[in-house]
Swiss-Prot record:
GO terms for cellular component: cytosol. ATP binds at S223, G224, G225, I226, D227, S228, T229. The keyword Cell wall biogenesis/degradation does not apply. The gene is guaA. Pathway: Purine metabolism; GMP biosynthesis; GMP from XMP (L-Gln route): step 1/1. It catalyses: XMP + L-glutamine + ATP + H2O = GMP + L-glutamate + AMP + diphosphate + 2 H(+). PANTHER family: GMP SYNTHASE [GLUTAMINE-HYDROLYZING] (PTHR11922:SF2), GMP SYNTHASE-RELATED (PTHR11922). GO terms for molecular function: ATP binding; GMP synthase activity. This is GMP synthase [glutamine-hydrolyzing]. Its EC number is 6.3.5.2. Catalyzes the synthesis of GMP from XMP. Residues 196-385 form the GMPS ATP-PPase domain.
């Protein structure tokens, strides 16, 4: 099934993924490729439009990202953003210079020549700038779109060739009319049809898996998280009972999580599920280990051993299902993968397993996986479940892991989640969890001195986990959470709220 494609050429800008996501929000399929993709490869992909991203370089800097001028002669619309606009201007005969006044932050754009990109947008437009170089003279055939106080040419366009450039970042929320301008580019200029939906994605993906994998066996390592759950359901729709999910309980799950996952898959989805309680095995391996990277390594290696043992019991397995996302594909620097590909030593799995991969989510961002989950009829509890790391509570118990610490943390986590669900805030938060530090503090309970653990609450909002901001609870809510945790969780006498954003902190503590 062919679909319209918009390509974002990545020049190293921090917003390249955001551009792709904004395009997809308009039901237009979009992929990111490196700026140095060959012109032949680009033509093979047959995009309906191209977006040139921003980037940290100067167009005159030695070794700065460049592109083939033939891109502008293919005959399809091109939109250059920030560095992308400067490069377009330079390659087509304009002049770019280092600006004496760098422009960072909000600016007011005065539109001098209205055009298809600015249609329906008011003349004085708030935009977000982040640049040093500026276009001093537009290329032949181009017009100036508008200016800001410090940038005389803040946008340019050639209506005959459908080439447009903006010095500002229309993809960020700080440019309020940016989405409208992007919509104008996609539909007024590129004449796209907005036919890419999660429903069509499901249909297309299931058919592709059916064609290549029907009648052959596949296994899926299930975590209970949304990625592996949605991946498993898509594959089950394609190959039915030939899929077996393996759910390894490493003893580091949240309260009652193993029961919830088993009930969901065995009763509601009727998927073949192998449940392995390997909690003692994992905890024995982790005894005395305090370094977070060592914890991750031990858990990863042990998971592989358990998974391999169970997969061999099934016998004659051809495929391994993974919940790889498009962000993983982009980060690895590879081109977009097909749903099914040949692969050895997957995630450290021994080469002799000789499995091919099925990755039904490798074209999707995290928020799109949630949309697919809704299309598949998954409950809100699963769809909006907060992200949970592979090593589980091992990296939320700081220092050495013991059964006592895990029990305390599980209970605290359950109490916080319960309270926030009661008052209707749980689903407003992107990620929420508690942390148990490797210290005890003095307190008073009743008339007696206590010496117990503190609990740290971490709650953040984010779009993709790359950056995050701490959630602003009211003082009343924090007081309720503190009272419940300290009174209901044995071994805790202090409650702390982490108000650090990412960056400088990471979301997880380890």
């Amino acid at each position: 099934m062919s679909r319209e494609l918009v390509i974002v050429l990545d020049f190293g800008g921090q917003y390249s993924r955001l551009i792709a996501r904004r395009i997809r929000e308009h039901n237009v399929y979009c992929e990111i490729y490196p700026y140095n993709i060959s012109i032949n490869k680009l033509k093979q992909l047959s995009p309906a439009a191209i977006v040139l991203s921003g980037g940290p370089s100067s167009v005159y800097q030695e070794g700065s990202p460049d592109l083939d001028t033939e891109i502008f002669e293919i005959g399809i619309p091109v939109l250059g953003i920030c560095y992308g606009m400067q490069l377009m201007a330079k390659k087509l005969g304009g002049t770019v210079t280092g600006s004496t006044k760098r422009e960072y932050g909000k600016a007011l754009l005065e539109i001098e020549n209205p055009n298809l990109l600015t249609e329906g947008v008011s003349s004085d437009l708030l935009v977000w700038m982040s640049h040093g170089d500026s276009v001093e003279q537009v290329p032949p055939g181009f017009k100036v779109m508008g200016k800001t106080e410090n940038t005389p040419i803040a946008g340019l366009f050639n209506p005959d060739k459908n080439l447009y450039g903006v010095q500002f970042h229309l993809e960020v929320m700080h440019t309020p009319k940016g989405r409208e301008m992007l919509k104008n580019f996609l539909f007024n200029i590129a004449d796209l049809s907005a036919d890419w939906t999660m429903g069509s994605y499901i249909e297309e993906t299931v058919e592709q898996i059916k064609t290549e994998a029907q009648g052959r066996k596949a296994v899926c390592g299930l975590s209970g998280g949304i990625d592996s759950t949605v991946a498993a359901l898509l594959v089950q729709k394609a190959i039915g009972d030939d899929l077996t999910c393996i759910f390894v309980n490493h003893g580091l799950l949240r309260k009652n999580e193993q029961d919830q996952v088993r009930e969901l898959f065995e009763q509601e989805f009727d998927i073949n599920l192998v449940y392995v309680d390997a909690s003692d095995r994992f905890l024995n391996k982790l005894q005395g280990v305090t370094d977070p990277e060592q914890k991750r390594k031990i858990i990863g290696e042990e998971f592989i051993r358990v998974f391999e043992e169970e997969a061999r019991k099934i016998g004659d397995v051809d495929f391994l299902v993974q919940g790889t996302l498009y962000t993983d594909v982009v980060e690895s620097g590879t081109e977009t993968a097909s749903v099914i590909k040949s692969h050895h030593n997957v995630g450290g799995l021994p080469e002799k397993m000789d499995l091919s991969l099925i990755e039904p989510l490798n074209s999707l961002f995290k928020d799109e996986v949630r949309q697919v989950a809704r299309e598949l009829g998954l409950h809100r509890e699963i769809v909006e479940r907060h992200p949970f790391p592979g090593p589980g509570l091992a990296i939320r118990v700081l220092g050495e892991i013991t059964k006592e610490k895990l029990d305390i943390l599980r209970e605290a986590d359950a109490v916080v989640s319960d309270e926030l669900k009661k008052i209707g805030l749980y689903h407003d938060i992107w990620q929420l969890f508690t942390v148990l530090p490797d210290i005890k503090t003095v307190g008073v309970k009743g008339d007696e001195r206590s010496y117990d653990y503190p609990i740290i609450l971490r709650a953040v909002n984010s779009e993709d986990g790359m950056t995050a901001d701490w959630y602003r609870f009211s003082n009343d809510v924090l007081e309720r959470l503190s009272n419940r945790v300290v009174n209901e969780v044995d071994g805790v006498n202090r409650f702390i709220y982490d108000i650090t954003s990412k960056p400088p902190a990471t979301i997880e503590w380890e």
